[in-house]
Amino acid sequence: MSGCDKFIGMLFLARDVTHSVHLNTRSYAKHQALGGFYDGIIDLADKFAEMYQGKYGLIGPIALMSAKKTSNVVEFLEDQAAEIESIRYDVVDRECTPLQNVIDEIVGLYYTTLYKLKFLA
């Protein structure tokens, strides 16, 4: 499989962006939602990377990315969730259900956080 390093880098970028917004918001609900996201995304990225390496071997250096646009965190998370859904079968074989399940958990965290940001913050 290819692209795992970029996939993990994408999750690291999400952590960086949401942590930055988390520290700069005046909304308690937004602060809490983003805090839950950046804590959760690192745990899931680590879980995914370890499982991936157990199946396919070492990933190698992680591709660290910089955000193109982060002024709207909801839009940023929506775009990333859509990208994850579009590349998931390029990163991991469709038949590798344990890793696909972790990707489901990752996407679920995005959607739960988007719900909190859109309707509770």
Positions of PLM-derived features:
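Acidic/histidine-rich alpha-helical segments that form the ligand environment
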Residues: L64-K118
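Short intrinsically disordered terminal tails
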Residues: M1, L120-A121
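Helix-loop segments that flank and shape redox-cofactor active sites
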Residues: L13-G36, V91, E95
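Short, solvent-exposed segments of well-ordered alpha helices
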Residues: S2-G9, Y28-G35, A67-S71, T97, ...
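Context-gated lysine
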Residues: K6, K30, K47, K55, ...
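Amphipathic, soluble alpha-helical interaction motifs
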Residues: V17-N24, K47, M51, E83-D90, ...
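Conserved alpha-helical segments that form or flank metal/cofactor-binding pockets of metalloenzymes
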Residues: H31-G60
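Generic structural signal for well-ordered, non-transmembrane alpha-helical segments
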Residues: D5, G9-F12, D16, G35, ...
